[in-house]
């Protein structure tokens, strides 16, 4: 079983990184292969809205803008489940997460029931390291993504610097439970 953890923070040692490690550890405890894709290191640009907003994404379910998106998209499609971890910036996912997820949404949501993410379990983690504000609105936008691509919302977890310790444990437990549920 292959779990992809999408990380969208420029930091490798902050709250978001700790959430990623907790998810990977939890999935691996249950015997899954879990690996991280660091979106910030993947050279993924924003959607160009080709051809009046509907380029190859609508009919071929692939993005014609060549960059790191193709590799990430393929890994996501080939995975059995996803964990999306983002820092909260201004009540939203990070810019790098939005770049990936906007393009992913266009490629997969347009496929309807043939979306390659249809029924795929997803854990969404929003990590607010500063004020702790914006968690609910960030998770709401992550939930819309999950709905649009036809994936299955397994868990939605908010984390801030005050609840960090027990929420890291929660993330690991959630990833482990997701793996167990797919057996």
Which residues does each predicted region cover?
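Short, glycine-/small-residue-rich phosphate/pyrophosphate-handling segment
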Residues: 95-96, 109-155
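N-terminal beta1-alpha1-beta2 submodule of the flavodoxin-like/Rossmannoid cofactor-binding fold
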Residues: 1-113, 153-183
